[in-house]
From Swiss-Prot:
It comes from the Eukaryota. GO terms for cellular component: mitochondrion. A stretch of 270 kb of the mitochondrial genome is duplicated within the centromere of chromosome 2 resulting in the duplication of the gene. The expression of this duplicated gene (At2g07724) is demonstrated. This is Uncharacterized mitochondrial protein AtMg00200. Keywords: Mitochondrion. It comes from Arabidopsis thaliana. It is found in: Mitochondrion.
């Protein structure tokens, strides 16, 4: 079932998205695409990042954010029966480490 983060099937571009149109992002969902997508990472990682980017532009409560029907809460608790979710957890850890490294360098 589609949720608030499903990409609209239009040519309308989101503001401040560096010219990427919504329908270009949906290509990540196309099973015929190679495992590496236009963003340079794996399809699921890029889809996850796209949802985070779009989520930052819309004032939705965190409780409404869904990843493949899995709740994504502040505690970061996600069910791990799906490889997409496992990859997303690893991505969150890597992003967190990068943020910590950058904040350490700024001191």
């Amino acid at each position: 079932m589609l949720n608030a983060f499903a990409f609209p099937q239009t040519n309308e571009c989101f503001p401040a998205k560096r010219g990427f149109c919504a329908n270009e992002r949906t290509k990540c969902l196309n099973p015929k695409m190679p495992s590496k997508s236009m963003f340079g990472g794996s399809v699921s990682e890029n889809l996850f990042l796209s949802k985070i980017r779009i989520g930052l532009s819309f004032p939705l409560p965190l409780s409404e954010i869904k990843l493949q029907n899995q709740d994504f809460r502040l505690e970061g608790q996600m069910s791990s029966f799906d490889p997409f979710v496992d990859e997303s957890k690893a991505l969150v850890r890597r992003l967190g480490q990068k943020v910590k490294a950058k904040s350490f360098l700024c001191r």
